[in-house]
Amino acid sequence: MSATKLTRREQRARAQHFIDTLEGTAFPNSKRIYITGTHPGVRVPMREIQLSPTLIGGSKEQPQYEENEAIPVYDTSGPYGDPQIAINVQQGLAKLRQPWIDARGDTEELTVRSSDYTKARLADDGLDELRFSGVLTPKRAKAGRRVTQLHYARQGIITPEMEFIAIRENMGRERIRSEVLRHQHPGMSFGARLPENITAEFVRDEVAAGRAIIPANINHPESEPMIIGRNFLVKVNANIGNSAVTSSIEEEVEKLVWSTRWGADTVMDLSTGRYIHETREWILRNSPVPIGTVPIYQALEKVNGIAEDLTWEAFRDTLLEQAEQGVDYFTIHAGVLLRYVPMTAKRLTGIVSRGGSIMAKWCLSHHQENFLYQHFREICEICAAYDVSLSLGDGLRPGSIQDANDEAQFAELHTLGELTKIAWEYDVQVMIEGPGHVPMQMIRRNMTEELEHCHEAPFYTLGPLTTDIAPGYDHFTSGIGAAMIGWFGCAMLCYVTPKEHLGLPNKEDVKQGLITYKIAAHAADLAKGHPGAQIRDNAMSKARFEFRWEDQFNLALDPFTARAYHDETLPQESGKVAHFCSMCGPKFCSMKISQEVRDYAATQTIEMGMADMSENFRARGGEIYLRKEEA
């Protein structure tokens, strides 16, 4: 923890400086590469980690080296990871997908905003200083048309987004030639289909079947296409957002950029404080990854935080507002039904979901069914017009391991399965949210129940936390559960930071949560046997055995921390080529000893072979030349 806590003014000033000086930055010894597709404009970014050669022999004066292949890795940082791209947060990112959207000819620009709230914000001159200057003219589907990736997939259309994703998911592994790097243990996939090569047709088929989603609002053309599904790489979401008591627009944009740098595949803006609308505009215009929200939070702000005063009309206006800004997926707590609320009465921790508790309070105060459930078809009509995916929220998720897998949790899950089928009638993409707090032995049931009752729609879980005893370390307690459920088939993991249950995360907390969850997601990919998942591990192990310290740092998920820990005890440059580290020292390094054993064994094999040949020579009489019949 930092020794000096910054004041609010200092935090804002630091964030503003970050934004003002922001430029594309590569990780150490990495470079940005692009792989092109067949569709115009399909140019898929990846990060390529450059490695040093391996010393294989020769003398001190004339050493002999063997080259090591560069390792391509999935990169979520967008333009922020390319030093060749000029960054201007005031202008936003380039609109990568705009030509693809326009070419389909099924959208139209809106001459007037659909949301009354948006109209009021735009008319308020007092917000000019906060407003993003380059606001897009929003689009929506033409009358009678649907513009979702699910609709196109069902029509047999392979979109540029689908080709982009296919290239991205393969992670450039076709470039790797080394058998050492390509070696991979068989996985246990629990029924997942993991083809050796992911094609655009495979992507289309998975989306058409509802097993995967491509969150890609037509009003967020800055986003780089990505996919969430059991048969693809496990993804990670990062939550950001201001509150009524802390954070600013500058800090949230900083956290967005920071999140994409450290591997967030999507980002959820959970803002609940002032200027939600303006904050979200800045985030969307500068985000290369899909953005999700929980619209009920903002709807509640519009009725001064009084849950009983919520109305369908206020919520609908919020959906239109956010859809026309470009939000890629909505978390909707439509499965919290009136009859399920009493099921939570005997729980230790009741209803812990903010959205779930809001809707439960509304249902009880009006003694009516959840208006999100009642108006679900209208929600789907809105989503179909903008290609907003639905993330069906688990408002009754367990908030303690004592409450795990109870009647309320699974009753809601079954309702989410019913709602999934309704959304699919409108060609709306759907994923299902899951818990929560679940001990290890009870985790797998969550996945099997979801697959069965939600028709294999992608599962998206918060952890789950496997124990409740570690406030301040819940990124660890949940990372364990996240790795397990990712292995069982969960498609996306929502990160948990060290501040979970304690406070709003800052920039460093975001990084810690993301690194923890990237580890969990990667461990799940390895366990499933995802093709190519082991390449980076093999490269790291090879570098470690060969004492290529710089390569070890650069192959790490966090090169800076790896280097810092090494340099705490061996800061000299000579320490970067030493055949030991400070843990064991030069005399007891297991890998150095292992190398010596290997060299000794190889020498012994040669000497034994020479001895065998000598014995054979003497047995044949010691003649240099043998008679033809003896040869």
Swiss-Prot record:
Domain of life: Bacteria
EC number: 4.1.99.17
InterPro entries named in the record: ThiC (IPR037509), ThiC-associated_dom (IPR025747), ThiC/Bza_core_dom (IPR038521), ThiC/BzaA/B (IPR002817)
Keywords: 4Fe-4S, Iron, Iron-sulfur, Lyase, Metal-binding, S-adenosyl-L-methionine, Thiamine biosynthesis, Zinc
Cofactor: [4Fe-4S] cluster
List of residues binding substrate: N239, M268, Y297, H333, S353, R354, G355, D394, G395, L396, R397, E433, Y460
GO terms under cellular component: cytosol
Cofactor binding mode and count: Binds 1 [4Fe-4S] cluster per subunit. The cluster is coordinated with 3 cysteines and an exchangeable S-adenosyl-L-methionine.
Binding of Zn(2+), residues: H437, H501
Reaction(s) catalysed (UniProt annotation): 5-amino-1-(5-phospho-beta-D-ribosyl)imidazole + S-adenosyl-L-methionine = 4-amino-2-methyl-5-(phosphooxymethyl)pyrimidine + CO + 5'-deoxyadenosine + formate + L-methionine + 3 H(+)
Binding, [4Fe-4S] cluster: C581, C584, C589
Any one GO BP annotation for this protein: thiamine diphosphate biosynthetic process
Name of one Pfam family that matches: ThiC-associated
GO MF annotation list: 4 iron, 4 sulfur cluster binding; carbon-carbon lyase activity; zinc ion binding
Pathway(s): Cofactor biosynthesis; thiamine diphosphate biosynthesis
Family according to the record: Belongs to the ThiC family.
HAMAP family found in the cross-reference section: ThiC (MF_00089)
Record NCBIfam families: PRK09284.1, PRK13352.1, thiC
Biological function: Catalyzes the synthesis of the hydroxymethylpyrimidine phosphate (HMP-P) moiety of thiamine from aminoimidazole ribotide (AIR) in a radical S-adenosyl-L-methionine (SAM)-dependent reaction.
Subunit-level organization: Homodimer.
UniProt-listed PANTHER family: PHOSPHOMETHYLPYRIMIDINE SYNTHASE, CHLOROPLASTIC, THIAMINE BIOSYNTHESIS PROTEIN THIC
Protein name from the UniProt record: Phosphomethylpyrimidine synthase
Source organism (scientific name): Escherichia coli (strain 55989 / EAEC)
